[in-house]
């Protein structure tokens, strides 16, 4: 999905102008810093120089603040306090943490309470109090300084409809406040259990909530920006945004959406949004806003990809993300769509910010741009930009006092992002007084301007990759629910399997399919127990024949060489891998499993086959027992029986598979694959 916009090399010459303007903003920012902000910057700069202090700080916020048990919380606090150094925390705080850590042995409750109070106090500029009086007062002060706020109601990830509804109501309540006129909302925070495989169904569900949200916005004059974090939410969020705003009720409404530059697909979706918004603008005269950010979910995206065996969705390096960001700026600030698409430049990197402003100026679209920053992260810089004539919108997370634990994840993420060596904010605390750090950031900026011309805009998640078999075992990757080919294939198979009526499943003995008179019903637990197949039930004679057959075959099977068994297991693994979507579809109807539940089970079964293939040499001197009876449970109808069958076969035994009566259709898939 490449970008539809070519880069403009003429803009490269604006880099020198941006650098000069950045120096001016830094000087002005230093003048505007009050005593409190200067002290905070010294404290943070000191903290960032000491990895142990960073680790201790993350422990304090991410663990001590979240744990309800005072005993456990105090124990973790003592561990963190031991890591507190004078280098990272300064003499007073460093010694104080050690002393309080010792005190927590005898007075855990007051110590933990004091820690909570201190963390809240230190974070009050980053996370605002959601209580009406406090928030209204803060908004008033910001407005007096020419700053505006984009409110984001923080909270834990929603797990069910009840939690989603509570969050939704808290957002609606915030929108009804007279002082609030701009709010950001993640669709995943107001609709629970979004299923990416069923993207149409998920879009329908979120669209219902969006209509309520937009009606409230129209009534109270609030601008709504759709936020997102997870890569999987990107296509759904963009599609829902366009669908609802195309409806007659909302076609004349202004609204916004975020795009994350650390995802290559952002370029494709930006092009899609531009083309759509121009048509919509021609119909109604209403514009949209695209908020360009670099991305704030990198660690989670990488962890999820590694866990499932996927290719990570984001760019691989910070320099690539920077190049992607300025390429988006190049594509965004253009006169041909300036009326239809407003652009939010959301970055604390003054080099990128000033370059964007120079690009807008050179193209005559300065009125198209909003500068956006994070509340509490760079107050003086925000004021300096405002005084230079460019209004600033501050992204402001809010939470109620009794829900502060939900804000801890935000704090940890901000800390994790800003402590990266390549991150501009880490350098920003000293950059104006440190020529070396300024030069480092200047060079990174110039590199991003140059590399924007060549940075790929093709998906990195969906790149073709093959698993080469080696002597080292590797897990089978889980199917990627964001992969269009997989979605299409599994959807097709589910429809095919759900159309099956009165399938008959035989016994298989000595390679012969046997349909007996005595049969049992196979039902669909997800469809009120509807009967969709019948399976044959063996008699005593059938059992005796099966045992005799397996005993006779045992000598031949155990006589195969290690390499011959290895080849058979590898072939079986390949067959199972190719039949993944079919197996998922059968399990969904036979065991009532969702795609997310069934797919890892198929991958686990493939792992069993490949594991025993790569470790077959360990069974070379084993003595087969003979015939092994595998009787699996119904709740893991594919992986467990495959694991049992493969283990027995690898040791030279023969196997009789007696499936759970509730999931015979799944067992029939296993037999077909093996």
Where are these predicted regions, by residue range?
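Positively charged, amphipathic and often flexible ligand-engagement surfaces
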Residues: 1-475
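Catalytic cores of nucleotide-enabled group-transfer and carboxylate-activating enzymes in metabolic
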Residues: 129-133, 143-149, 159, 219-224, ...
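Conserved hydrophobic/aromatic pocket- or pore-lining residues that grip, position, or stack substrates
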Residues: 151, 529, 565, 587, ...
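Active-site-adjacent "gating/activation" loops or surface patches in catalytic cores
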Residues: 200-204, 301, 515-527, 536, ...
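Active-site-adjacent beta-strand anchor residues
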Residues: 227, 346, 536, 631, ...
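Extended hydrophobic-aromatic, low-complexity segments
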Residues: 343, 354-356, 424, 531-534, ...
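Short, structured beta/alpha segment
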Residues: 426, 430-589, 611, 618
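Rossmann-like NAD(P) dinucleotide-binding subdomain of oxidoreductase/dehydrogenase enzymes
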Residues: 588, 614-674
């Amino acid at each position: 999905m490449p970008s539809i916009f070519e880069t403009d090399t003429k803009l490269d010459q604006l880099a020198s102008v941006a650098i000069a303007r950045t120096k001016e903003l830094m000087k002005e920012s230093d003048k505007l810093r009050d005593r409190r902000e200067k002290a905070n910057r010294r404290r943070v700069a000191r903290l960032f120089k000491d990895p142990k202090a960073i680790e201790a700080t993350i422990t304090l916020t991410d663990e001590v603040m979240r744990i309800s048990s005072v005993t456990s919380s105090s124990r973790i606090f003592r561990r963190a306090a031991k890591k507190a150094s004078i280098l990272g925390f300064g003499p007073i705080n460093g010694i104080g943490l050690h002393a309080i850590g010792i005190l927590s042995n005898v007075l855990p409750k007051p110590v933990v309470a004091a820690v909570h109070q201190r963390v809240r106090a230190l974070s009050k500029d980053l996370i605002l109090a959601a209580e009406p009086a406090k928030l209204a007062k803060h908004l008033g002060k910001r407005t007096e300084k020419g700053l505006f706020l984009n409110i984001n109601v923080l909270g834990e990830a929603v797990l069910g409809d009840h939690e989603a509804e509570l969050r939704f109501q808290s957002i609606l309540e915030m929108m009804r406040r007279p002082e609030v006129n701009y709010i950001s909302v993640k669709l995943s925070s107001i609709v629970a259990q979004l299923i990416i495989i069923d993207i149409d169904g998920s879009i329908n569900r979120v669209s219902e909530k969006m209509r309520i949200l937009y009606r409230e916005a129209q009534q109270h004059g609030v601008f709504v920006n759709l936020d997102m974090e997870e890569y999987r939410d990107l296509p759904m969020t963009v599609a829902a945004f366009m669908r609802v705003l195309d409806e007659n009720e909302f076609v004349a409404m202004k609204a916004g959406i975020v795009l994350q530059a650390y995802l290559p697909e952002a370029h494709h979706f930006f092009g899609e949004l531009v083309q759509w918004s121009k048509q919509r603008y021609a119909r109604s005269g209403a514009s949209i806003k695209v908020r360009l950010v670099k991305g704030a979910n990198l660690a989670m995206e990488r962890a999820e990809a590694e866990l499932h065996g996927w290719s990570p969705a984001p760019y691989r390096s910070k320099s690539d993300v920077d190049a992607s960001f300025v390429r988006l700026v190049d594509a965004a600030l253009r006169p041909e769509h300036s009326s239809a698409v407003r652009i939010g430049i959301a970055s604390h990197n003054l080099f990128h910010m000033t370059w964007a402003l120079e690009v807008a100026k050179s193209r005559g679209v300065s009125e198209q741009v909003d500068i956006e920053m994070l509340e509490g992260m760079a107050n003086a810089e925000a004021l300096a930009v405002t005084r230079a004539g460019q209004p600033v919108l501050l992204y402001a997370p809010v939470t109620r006092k009794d829900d502060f634990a939900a804000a801890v994840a935000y704090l940890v993420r901000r800390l994790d992002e800003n402590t990266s060596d390549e991150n501009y904010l880490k350098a920003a605390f000293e950059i104006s007084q440190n020529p070396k750090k300024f030069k480092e950031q200047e060079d990174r900026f110039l590199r991003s301007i140059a590399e924007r011309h060549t940075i790929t805009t093709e998906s990195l998640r969906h790149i073709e990759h093959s698993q080469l078999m080696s002597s080292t075992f590797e897990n089978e990757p889980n199917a990627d629910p964001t992969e269009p080919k997989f979605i299409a294939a599994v959807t097709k198979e589910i429809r095919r399997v759900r159309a099956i009526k009165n399938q008959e499943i035989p016994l298989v003995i000595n390679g012969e399919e046997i349909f007996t008179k005595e049969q049992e019903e196979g039902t669909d637990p997800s469809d009120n127990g509807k009967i969709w197949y019948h399976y044959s039930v063996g008699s005593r004679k059938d059992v005796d024949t099966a045992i005799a057959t397996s005993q006779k075959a045992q000598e031949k099977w155990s006589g195969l060489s290690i390499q011959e068994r290895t080849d058979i297991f590898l072939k079986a693994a390949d067959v199972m891998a190719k039949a993944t979507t079919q197996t998922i579809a059968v399990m969904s109807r036979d065991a009532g499993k969702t795609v997310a539940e069934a797919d890892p089970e198929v991958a686990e079964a493939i792992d069993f086959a490949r594991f025993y293939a790569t470790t077959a040499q360990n069974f070379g001197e084993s003595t087969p027992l003979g015939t092994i009876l595998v009787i699996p449970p119904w709740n893991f109808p594919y992986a467990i029986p495959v694991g049992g069958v493969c283990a027995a076969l690898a040791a030279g035994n023969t196997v009789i598979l007696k499936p759970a009566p509730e999931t015979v259709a799944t067992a029939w898939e296993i037999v077909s694959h093996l």
